[in-house]
Amino acid sequence: MSEGERDDTDRLIADFLGTGEEPTPADHRSGYVAVVGKPNVGKSTLVNALVGHKVAIISPKPQTTRRRILGILTRPDAQVLFLDTPGVHEPKQALHRYMMREVDAALKDCDAVLFVTDVSRLPNDEDRRVAQRIARLSQPKFLAMNKADLLDPRDVIEHVAAHEALLAPASQEGRGAMGGAPRASEAGSRESVEPAGSIFNPQFSMLTSGTRGDNLDKLLSMLLATLPYGPRYFPPGQTTDQNERFLAAEFVREQALRFLEQEVPHGIAVTIEDWQTRPNGMIYIAATIYVERESQKGILIGKGGDMLKKIGANARKEIERELGAKVYLELWAKVRPGWRRDDALVARFLEGNS
């Protein structure tokens, strides 16, 4: 099949799926970008900022993201499909293994890789493991040194050099950033000049801030330049492929992460039990929050039910904002001992709202 015939086929597929009101131009680009990094480096905040809509919940607590989350950015000249992924870590139980399979699936399916680090801190072995994990991939790779808004100006040179040293060939580690290659600046980027054999070897690296929006337009331009020519796969205005039940469950979990402390948030799962649109247009949602121990259930409910009410009230506002409708949210607390260690329960809790 010639290139022209392939383009025609792509357009026919997109039209059949109903993904556009008009044919996409011949120079239209589209593709998947896997967003990867260790936990708590701001991947979800960055994806939300790039998409321009909240498609993934955020929390300062690590391991907030448990599944691949698709964020769709549509422009006249391109459609970028960001795959927000769980933070890469050593799997110790069934939940962690599930999360790492989600990372591997995103890397397998993507057209480009965006490696995200937290430049406000010096890199550690977790960052190096992520770099090594993606080194074997043939797709174009980019480094986003994120959380630049939290970077102390006195630390810029040291921290940028340390993060770019993640990319240095093994034989040059310890010599400084890139073995003497030019460093990224706060205002711009640089093309990679690493020799063959680098651990990571990206096309570009850049300081970014998902919270403040630093350099996101430039980062996006770099990503777009490497994506293949192709059709629009989702209609304009659609920002994710996640359904409303999944999003509602995630908003409940986000508020639980926000208000609960210590180990309780890590053992939480949320399932939607009932969803009804009532004659007056109000949406009734019943959800169950699962924890692993009775003591955690008591903390989740709170004195006189205060904690559960607080989580519900804040989650309801997020759900109403997303749905554009009034919501009556009813929450229940239940105990499911050791669910994070049970493959079947992990799959049920993480996929049951899809």
Where are these regions (language model features)?
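Conserved G1/Walker A P-loop phosphate-binding module
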Residues: 2-101, 105-107
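Residue-level signature of catalytic and energy-coupling elements of molecular machines
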Residues: 36, 40, 46, 69, ...
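Conserved glycine(s) of the Walker
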Residues: 42, 215, 307
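Conserved, well-folded catalytic cores of nucleic-acid-processing
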Residues: 53, 72-76, 91, 106-113, ...
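Conserved C-terminal guanine-recognition region of P-loop GTPase G domains, centered on the G4
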Residues: 77, 100-171, 200-204, 278-279
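G-domain G4 guanine-recognition motif of GTPases
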Residues: 85, 117-120, 142-156, 206-214, ...
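Canonical P-loop GTPase G-domain recognition
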Residues: 140, 149-186, 190-240
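P-loop NTP-binding site
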Residues: 244-354
